[in-house]
Amino acid sequence: MNTELQPKLEKSAVNFQAKPRKQKIRKDPNAPFIREKLELPDGHNKLLLHSCCAPCSGEVMEAILASGIEFTIYFYNPNIHPLKEYLIRKEENIRFAKKFGIPFIDADYDRQNWFDRAKGMEWEPERGIRCTMCFDMRFEKAAEYAHKHGFPVFTSCLGISRWKDMNQINGCGHRAAEKYDDVIYWDYNWRKEGGSQRMIEISKRERFYQQEYCGCVYSLRDSNKWREETGRQKIEIGKLYYSAD
C-alpha cells in the first residue's frame, strides 16, 4: 500500500543557484556549486523521480530543486536484499527528502514478485538481462504511478552511477513510458557537468549510508565472492557510512 510523506518545506543553507546552460561548473569543491537550469520535456513542470537510494538521488534532487521543478520521489525497489539493507536505504532517502520537504511515495516491497521474475537469471552478470528485468520491473511501476496520479514525466537517478549502463537504463525507461499516451520518460544525463562527483560530495556532506553492492541478493553474492578471492572482508550490512573527510 502506498503512503505519502509530505513534510513542511524547510529552508536550506545549501546553494541551489541555477544558471543558464552556457555557464561552467566551478571546480573548487568549497565554492558555491553553480548548476545549469533544467527543463522537462515538452514544457512540463511536474516530475516523478524514481529513486533507488539517497547517494544516487542526492545530486539529482538538488539539481531538480535548483531549477524550480515540482517533483515527488517514488521509492520502489523490491530487488534490494536483505530487508535490513532495504530499510536502511529507504530511511536514508526519506531523511534527505524531509530535509527539503519533498513528497515521498513509499511503494510496496514486492520482493517475491522480483524473485519470480528473476528465475533463470540467477547467474547472469552485472549489466546483463537480469538487470534489464530489474529496471523494467521498477520503471513499469513508476510509469503506472505517473499515469494514475497525473505526472506527465518520470525519470530515475539510477543512471548517475558509473557502475550502471545508461543506455540499458534509458531503454527500460522509454519502454515503460510507451505504454501510456500521457507519460514521458526523461532520459537526462545526470553524470554530466560533474554530476557523478557532486553525488559523492553530497553523500559525504550528508553522511549517507554507503552501500557496497548494487542491491539484489545475487549482487551481494558476487561482491562477497570477489572480496573473498581478493582477501577483503565480506560486506557488513548497515556498517559503512560516508565521512566528511
Curated annotation (Swiss-Prot):
Binding, [4Fe-4S] cluster: 52-53, 131, 134
EC number of this enzyme: 1.17.99.6
GO biological process assignments: queuosine biosynthetic process; tRNA modification
Disulfide bond sites: 214-216
Highest taxon in the source lineage: Bacteria
GO molecular function per UniProt: 4 iron, 4 sulfur cluster binding; epoxyqueuosine reductase activity; metal ion binding
Reaction it catalyzes: epoxyqueuosine(34) in tRNA + AH2 = queuosine(34) in tRNA + A + H2O
The UniProt record lists the keyword tRNA processing: yes
Class of enzymatic activity (EC top level): oxidoreductase
Any matching Pfam family: QueH
InterPro entries cross-referenced by the UniProt entry: QueH (IPR003828)
Alphabetic keyword roster: 4Fe-4S, Disulfide bond, Iron, Iron-sulfur, Metal-binding, Oxidoreductase, Queuosine biosynthesis, Redox-active center, tRNA processing
Pathway listed: tRNA modification; tRNA-queuosine biosynthesis
Similarity comment: Belongs to the QueH family.
Protein task: Catalyzes the conversion of epoxyqueuosine (oQ) to queuosine (Q), which is a hypermodified base found in the wobble positions of tRNA(Asp), tRNA(Asn), tRNA(His) and tRNA(Tyr).
Official protein name in the record: Epoxyqueuosine reductase QueH
Originating organism: Haemophilus influenzae (strain ATCC 51907 / DSM 11121 / KW20 / Rd)
